[in-house]
From Swiss-Prot:
The keyword RNA-binding applies. CDD domains: Ribosomal_L22. Belongs to the universal ribosomal protein uL22 family. HAMAP family: Ribosomal_uL22_B (MF_01331_B). This is Large ribosomal subunit protein uL22. GO terms for biological process: translation. This protein binds specifically to 23S rRNA; its binding is stimulated by other ribosomal proteins, e.g. L4, L17, and L20. It is important during the early stages of 50S assembly. It makes multiple contacts with different domains of the 23S rRNA in the assembled 50S subunit and ribosome. The globular domain of the protein is located near the polypeptide exit tunnel on the outside of the subunit, while an extended beta-hairpin is found that lines the wall of the exit tunnel in the center of the 70S ribosome. GO terms for molecular function: rRNA binding; structural constituent of ribosome.
Length: 121
């Protein structure tokens, strides 16, 4: 018995070692997951968060990959998955009173976005 599944082609892009905490990036990714490419770009343009810049860059890269590698039309693309994982933290030290030093962790994250052709309905 053979089963044939018609899955939509998926293009993805990754942004690694992006400065910013994972929780702040996930807050934005949760808003755009499942939306069309055009809707996501409009939302990202007007959101008041600093993490929208790198997310927009990764999203445009994923759409460019879909257009160049798979020949898909950008108008028909939907964000099928968007995730952020924790990257390494850069450790810095802040001088404090009486010779002490406090550690400051500058967090990084890895952003992954996958786009797929919108299913015909």
């Amino acid at each position: 018995m053979t089963t044939s599944s018609t899955t939509a082609p998926i293009a993805q892009a990754h942004g690694r070692f992006i400065r910013g905490s994972v929780s702040k990036v996930r807050r934005v990714l949760d808003q755009i997951r499942g939306r069309t490419y055009r809707d996501a770009l409009i939302m990202l343009e007007f959101m008041p968060y600093r993490s929208t810049g790198p997310i927009t860059k990764v999203l445009r890269s994923a759409v460019a990959n879909a257009e160049h590698n798979l020949g898909l039309d950008p108008a028909s693309l939907v964000i099928s998955s968007a995730s952020a994982d924790m990257g390494p933290s850069m450790k810095r030290y802040r001088p404090r009173a009486q010779g002490r030093a406090f550690q400051i962790k500058k967090q990084t994250c890895h952003i992954s976005i996958a786009v797929a052709a919108q299913p015909d309905s």
